[in-house]
Regions:
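Alpha-helical structural elements of signaling/regulatory helical domains
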Residues: 9-10, 46
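Conserved AAA+ ATPase "sensor/coupling" helix adjacent to the nucleotide-binding pocket
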Residues: 1-9, 15-21, 36-41
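Conserved P-loop NTPase/AAA+ ATPase motor core
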Residues: 22, 28-183
Length: 183
């Protein structure tokens, strides 16, 4: 709210939701986000910043610019939709992860699609939280196997994320029943 004081904000903007969607951003990042949202609103021809402007600005800042130059085949779009759907399904049904916020198959940054959860404000994380996060990360790969019977290269980042969390669970946090705590 500090960075939006001198801006005209639409009535559909919920600053609490925006705050949850920008956890971890520094003051300068938030100021940049508000300015980007104002630019999006101006391009839209609006005199006030609405929720959609904040969402588009946040997506651009956090996920990267939408890459309209990427031309996906119908099969690639279908595979991306099922892949992201796998992440979204698990984010919805697993009880210990962060809640699902947005799913898109519009290419952004280096990704062909994105499933985004809003992180809860926490200071510590449970073993169950990490297990659900790993499951969610692998959900896209599982969906590809179930629907298409094979994998493609689009899940590399998911595999990196899941592996990184699993390693840290064992090496740093002592969350392995088999290995046990170590120093």
């Amino acid at each position: 709210e500090v960075h939006s004081r001198d801006k005209r904000i639409g009535t559909d903007v919920d600053m609490d939701t925006m705050a949850k969607a920008t956890v971890g951003m520094a003051g300068a990042d938030l100021a940049n986000l508000v300015n980007e949202a104002a630019l999006v609103a101006v391009r839209r021809g609006s005199k006030e910043i609405e929720r959609i402007d904040f969402e588009n600005a946040r997506d651009r800042v956090v996920l990267g610019a939408q890459r309209e130059s990427v031309i996906m085949t119908a099969e690639e779009k279908r595979a991306t939709a099922y892949h992201e759907g796998g992440h979204a399904l698990l984010a919805t049904v697993l009880p210990n992860g962060d809640p699902l916020h947005k799913v898109t198959i519009l290419p952004r940054g280096m990704a062909l699609g994105v499933t985004w959860s809003l992180p809860q404000e926490r200071h510590t994380y449970s073993k169950e939280y990490f297990e659900d996060t790993i499951c969610k990360a692998m959900g896209g790969r599982v969906a590809e196997i179930v629907v298409f019977g094979h994998l493609n290269s689009g899940a590399a980042n998911d595999l990196e994320q899941a592996t990184s969390i699993a390693r840290r669970m064992v090496r740093e946090w002592g969350m392995s029943d088999r290995v046990g705590p170590q120093a």
